[in-house]
Amino acid sequence: GLWSTIKQKGKEAAIAAAKAAGKAVLNAASEAL
């Protein structure tokens, strides 16, 4: 249904945001070294 589609999209967006945040942290850490 519509609600499960919304939840799935939200989960995918959250995972993508977490990956992007993790990559940004790694980039900042490597530049700080």
Swiss-Prot record:
Native species: Pithecopus hypochondrialis
Superkingdom in the source lineage: Eukaryota
GO CC terms, sorted: extracellular region
Protein's UniProt name: Dermaseptin-H6
Modified residues (Leucine amide): 33
Protein task: Has antimicrobial activity.
Alphabetical GO biological process terms: defense response
Pfam families: DD_K
Keywords: Amidation, Amphibian defense peptide, Antimicrobial, Secreted
Coiled-coil portions: none
Matches recorded under InterPro entries: Dermaseptin_dom (IPR022731)
